[in-house]
């Protein structure tokens, strides 16, 4: 019985490459000369640093550009509040979303049941397993989920036949 998993996880290798490219551009840009602007990556979060609110926004723009070029969906990023860290310096923590939330997984299973396609959806931790008799049905479910779930980036992996 063919099946696949619906997950929500960023490509961490590409994310790391985008952060390194952003830091390289920030270090060479004229408008950041002598500033302490940078992006730090640790586990499941990024930290943006800037000399003031405007420079922090510029760092964010550079990072988003590099992420888009590397093919990392920016919907994985969850921006926290900006914080002052002494003087005029600012920082902003950006959490990286991982796993399908309980609410979203229930929504995905409900969408699958309402679609009347002959497949079953089951919640398994932070993923949703979809299994059906035909591969064509699974492809129809993937197309339907890509169309209907737009607020969260979904990946489809662990295909079994």
From Swiss-Prot:
Keyword tags: Nucleotide-binding
Transmembrane segments annotated in the record for this chain: none
One Pfam family cited in the UniProt record for this chain: DUF520
The UniProt record lists the keyword Nucleotide-binding: yes
GO cellular component: cytosol
A GO molecular function held by the record: nucleotide binding
Nucleotide-binding recorded as keyword: yes
Family in the record: Belongs to the YajQ family.
PANTHER family attached to this UniProt entry: UPF0234 PROTEIN YAJQ
NCBIfam families reported for this sequence: PRK05412.1
Function field: Nucleotide-binding protein.
Protein name listed in UniProt: Nucleotide-binding protein RSc2549
Organism: Ralstonia nicotianae (strain ATCC BAA-1114 / GMI1000) (Ralstonia solanacearum)
């Amino acid at each position: 019985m063919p099946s696949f998993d619906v997950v929500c996880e960023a490509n961490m290798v590409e994310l790391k490459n985008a952060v390194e490219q952003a830091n390289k551009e920030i270090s060479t840009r004229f408008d950041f000369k002598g500033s302490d602007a940078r992006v730090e990556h640790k586990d499941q979060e990024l930290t943006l640093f800037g000399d003031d609110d405007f420079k922090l926004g510029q760092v964010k723009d550079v990072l988003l550009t590099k992420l888009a070029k590397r093919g990392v969906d920016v919907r994985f990023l969850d921006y926290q509040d900006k914080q002052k860290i002494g003087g005029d310096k600012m920082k902003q923590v950006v959490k990286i979303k991982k796993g399908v939330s309980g609410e979203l997984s229930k929504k995905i299973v409900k969408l699958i049941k309402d679609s009347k396609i002959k497949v079953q959806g089951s919640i398994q931790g932070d993923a949703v397993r979809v299994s059906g008799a035909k591969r064509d049905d699974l492809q129809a479910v993937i197309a339907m989920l890509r169309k209907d779930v737009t607020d969260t980036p979904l990946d489809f992996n662990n295909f079994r036949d």
